[in-house]
Amino acid sequence: MANAYKQAGVDIEAGYEAVSRMKKHVQTTMRKEVLGGLGGFGGMFDLSKFALEEPVLVSGTDGVGTKLMLAFMADKHDTIGIDAVAMCVNDIVVQGAEPLFFLDYIACGKAEPSKIENIVKGISEGCRQAGCALIGGETAEMPGMYSTEEYDLAGFTVGIVDKKKIVTGEKIEAGHVLIGLASSGIHSNGYSLVRKVLLEDGELSLERIYGRLELPLGEELLKPTKIYVKPILELLKKHEVYGMAHITGGGFIENIPRMLPEGIGAEIELGSWEIQPIFSLLQEVGKLEEKEMFNIFNMGIGMVVAVKEEDAKDVVRLLEEQGEMARIIGRTIQGAGVTFNGGTAL
């Protein structure tokens, strides 16, 4: 029967080898609350030691999107897992939640043990950066659904926060200061446009360095999404944060309003932070308007937090002590949506 399954395109032995290879990476993510080991039907996590008055679980799920196609093209698979973790944990930390555990889903056309190991190696690195345990996952070999070189990657995370400490944004008022935390680059959104502009229409090479880039284009595009969990959790211990936004698909224009209450808008001061060269390259090669750029990409800012003006300098200092590049990038105002430089809507 095993031979028949292999003839159908599913290699059970390769799957077993992949699981064996990934165990050493998964083990590095373990927390004391994890019960059982890898390979059970379900992952278990003990919540009994959390001394919270009203514990609330916060969940998030996401994928890496077409950034995966860059990994296929470059045959580099050891960092794309960081992206999968980042997209999930950054989404729940903006509500004040500490990520507890993570599960992954890998669907592929052919289970190559070394490739699967590299993917999980990246996932494990992301989990370590976020302080959460990789307690389970699924690797599905699906011949006919994907080509032998292709795979899809998604993840799921659960975190915890005391109900009274949930960050909702509902108390944001006009005059609060917006602090931006620098991104590592494009992160994990907008890659369908990136590929069209730079690779299809622009015919740029992944091996060459262009313009002010410091790395070959392929390395620049595969930079992992920054994980903000540890600095944000440290910030929440020391200061009151009124709202946070993870700048993902939809850029500034769509994501900042998600943290703002009705009647409050955001005014952003262009020039208050450095926009990385990769965005300038995209805009130049693709002849994209500035509004499009801010409506698609993070433009150098991966996370925005709203604090009182009297706390702003201390918050910037704390974040920089945590290794982040933090800048005051704007303020909240009466109104709606996002405007730039004194009320100009892009």
Swiss-Prot record:
Its EC number is 6.3.3.1. Gene3D superfamilies: PurM-like C-terminal domain (3.90.650.10), PurM-like, N-terminal domain (3.30.1330.10). InterPro entries: PurM-like_C_dom, PurM-like_C_sf, PurM-like_N, PurM-like_N_sf, PurM_cligase. CDD domains: PurM. It is found in: Cytoplasm. One of its GO terms (cellular component) is cytosol. Pathway: Purine metabolism; IMP biosynthesis via de novo pathway; 5-amino-1-(5-phospho-D-ribosyl)imidazole from N(2)-formyl-N(1)-(5-phospho-D-ribosyl)glycinamide: step 2/2. It catalyses: 2-formamido-N(1)-(5-O-phospho-beta-D-ribosyl)acetamidine + ATP = 5-amino-1-(5-phospho-beta-D-ribosyl)imidazole + ADP + phosphate + H(+). Keywords: ATP-binding, Cytoplasm, Ligase, Nucleotide-binding, Purine biosynthesis. GO terms for molecular function: ATP binding; phosphoribosylamine-glycine ligase activity; phosphoribosylformylglycinamidine cyclo-ligase activity. It comes from the Bacteria. One of its GO terms (biological process) is purine nucleotide biosynthetic process. Pfam families: AIRS (PF00586), AIRS_C (PF02769). Belongs to the AIR synthase family. HAMAP family: AIRS. This is Phosphoribosylformylglycinamidine cyclo-ligase. It comes from Bacillus cereus (strain ATCC 14579 / DSM 31 / CCUG 7414 / JCM 2152 / NBRC 15305 / NCIMB 9373 / NCTC 2599 / NRRL B-3711).
